[in-house]
């Protein structure tokens, strides 16, 4: 197929396909520059600034390393920041390690067409197509109203202090299965039937088949979720904002680091410099860790 050539006023011919391609990539490139590079560069600058004035007249001035000193004091002398980090690591463990393990087992059960496999697939995937805030409302009504009435027990108080983080963590893990199960089942469907048939003839048990045959084949899909989990280890707010808005900050030891940063920026613009400092430090830890995990998983898959 010949190229489309446009003739300019000076008689020069311009490749029309090249112009079309440039126009198509212009929008995403501009979006990347504005909403990623510029925004993150501004966040980097805020880490070295302090808030001056009031909300009617917002001003920032250079603060040097003062925000980093404040962060060090919070880490060493207070418990709120350490509790938030602990909750973030707990969230990562249950969503990335426990959650992925359970999702792989459920996917294998569905792949082998076990008892009620189609029903499990529907139940696990259906929540992922509903808005998160709707799922939060349904979960809260179910736990605090329906279960106490049916079982004649006291409400579990999802919004209460002491149960806010465990309830949000359970919700996050439970409703994160859908996308994983769908991808794992799709990857398992690509496994050659002859390989599985040969394993069956050789008398391979389901556990060995899962460990030796299935998991190596779906490792790229598993790696994707593991890498994403590491990359968001400090920014995952575990749906706490959906349950509590910014009020969970008032509860002792209930916030994750991701929720703390999000809620602090929602509360006041005065918190921007300190939150930017925390975010910059988290990036300095998570970025190399993400690349290391990615490299390790790539070697494991070779």
Each model region followed by its residue ranges:
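Short, Lys/Arg-rich, polar N-terminal cytosolic tail immediately upstream
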Residues: 1-15
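A structural signal for multi-pass alpha-helical bundles of membrane permease subunits
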Residues: 14-302
């Amino acid at each position: 197929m010949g190229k489309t050539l446009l003739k300019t006023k000076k008689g020069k011919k311009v490749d029309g396909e090249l112009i079309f391609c440039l126009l198509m990539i212009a929008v995403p490139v501009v979006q990347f520059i504005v909403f990623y590079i510029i925004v993150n560069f501004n966040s980097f600058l805020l880490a070295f600034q302090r808030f001056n004035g009031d909300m009617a007249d917002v001003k920032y001035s250079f603060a040097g390393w003062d925000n980093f000193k404040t962060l060090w004091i919070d880490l060493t002398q207070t418990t709120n920041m350490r509790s938030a980090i602990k909750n973030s690591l707990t969230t990562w463990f249950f969503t990335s390690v426990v959650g992925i393990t359970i999702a792989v087992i459920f996917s294998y059960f569905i792949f082998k067409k076990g008892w009620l496999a189609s029903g499990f697939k529907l139940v696990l995937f259906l929540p992922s197509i509903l808005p998160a805030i709707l799922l939060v409302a349904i979960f809260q009504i179910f736990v605090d109203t329906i279960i106490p009435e049916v079982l004649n027990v006291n409400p579990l108080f999802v919004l209460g202090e002491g149960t806010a983080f465990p309830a949000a963590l359970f919700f996050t893990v439970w409703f994160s299965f859908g996308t994983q199960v769908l991808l794992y089942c799709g990857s398992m469907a690509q496994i050659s039937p002859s390989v599985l048939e040969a394993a069956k003839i050789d008398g391979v048990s389901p556990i060995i088949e899962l460990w030796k045959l299935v998991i190596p084949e779906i490792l790229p899909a598993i790696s994707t979720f593991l890498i994403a989990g590491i990359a968001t280890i400090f920014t995952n707010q575990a749906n706490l904002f959906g349950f509590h808005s910014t009020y969970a900050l008032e509860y002792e030891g209930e916030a994750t680091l991701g929720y703390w940063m999000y809620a602090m920026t929602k509360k006041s613009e005065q918190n921007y410099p300190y939150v930017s400092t925390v975010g910059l430090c988290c990036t300095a830890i998570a970025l190399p860790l993400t690349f290391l995990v990615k490299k390790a998983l790539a070697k494991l898959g070779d």
